[in-house]
Amino acid sequence: MATLFIADLHLCAEEPAITAGFLRFLAREARKADALYILGDLFEAWIGDDDPNPLHRQMAAAIKAVSDSGVPCYFIHGNRDFLLGKRFARESGMTLLPEEKVLELYGRRVLIMHGDTLCTDDIGYQAFRAKVHKPWLQTLFLALPLFVRKRIAARMRANSKEANSSKSLAIMDVNQNAVVSAMEKHQVQWLIHGHTHRPAVHELIANQQPAFRVVLGAWHTEGSMVKVTADDVELIHFPF
């Protein structure tokens, strides 16, 4: 058996091929897993659990079917869907996890997260993140009419796209000191995360020992998952 990790699907109505690929993944690979962990940015945007978007209802039902089959499903918020709440988690049968979580997997201690908190060189983004994660601001936003939230979210996405276009690739990647600090704080030799869309297995030193950082790929033209078994930790890409 295996534990599976995915991230950065950025599901939206404009990308039906990705949605179809995810549904096939849930019907096949996910059903055979010990557990499924979704490490953020499952959706391209999330403006509240009360959004009647048909895609959200479809995904909730599909994930719930996996959960009901006996495969536990877990979710860590990403930078796109950090407002996903308890209502959707309940509808989809997912358990919401904190932004950093340590798992005991087949004899390994593994730290999992979305990954945006590791990009400490992107000072502008980190300031924005700190602001939008304030509970009072989230409560205020979610109290707004749905059409107002949609307009605000569209404007924020446009601003983010414009800002990122002028940033260097290095700034938007993880900071190595932040990586080592997180791994040493949690006393782990394995870290799995998404966010950067740069799939790879990196070797480093943490806790004065060899360590590994596994980065999930985004679901653009193919699927990406990390498969952890008693024997191995694999980064796997597969066609939709």
UniProtKB/Swiss-Prot annotation:
Binding, substrate: 79-80, 122, 160, 164, 167, 195
Catalysed reaction equations from the record: UDP-2-N,3-O-bis[(3R)-3-hydroxytetradecanoyl]-alpha-D-glucosamine + H2O = 2-N,3-O-bis[(3R)-3-hydroxytetradecanoyl]-alpha-D-glucosaminyl 1-phosphate + UMP + 2 H(+)
Cofactor note text: Binds 2 Mn(2+) ions per subunit in a binuclear metal center.
Keywords: Cell inner membrane, Cell membrane, Hydrolase, Lipid A biosynthesis, Lipid biosynthesis, Lipid metabolism, Manganese, Membrane, Metal-binding
InterPro entries: Calcineurin-like_PHP_ApaH, LpxH-like, Metallo-depent_PP-like, UDP-diacylglucosamine_Hdrlase
One matching Pfam family: Metallophos
Pathway this chain belongs to: Glycolipid biosynthesis; lipid IV(A) biosynthesis; lipid IV(A) from (3R)-3-hydroxytetradecanoyl-[acyl-carrier-protein] and UDP-N-acetyl-alpha-D-glucosamine: step 4/6
Primary localization: membrane
UniProt cross-references to CDD domains, sorted A to Z: MPP_YbbF-LpxH
Family, as annotated: Belongs to the LpxH family.
Cross-referenced PANTHER family: UDP-2,3-DIACYLGLUCOSAMINE HYDROLASE (PTHR34990:SF1), UDP-2,3-DIACYLGLUCOSAMINE HYDROLASE-RELATED (PTHR34990)
Name of the protein in its database record: UDP-2,3-diacylglucosamine hydrolase
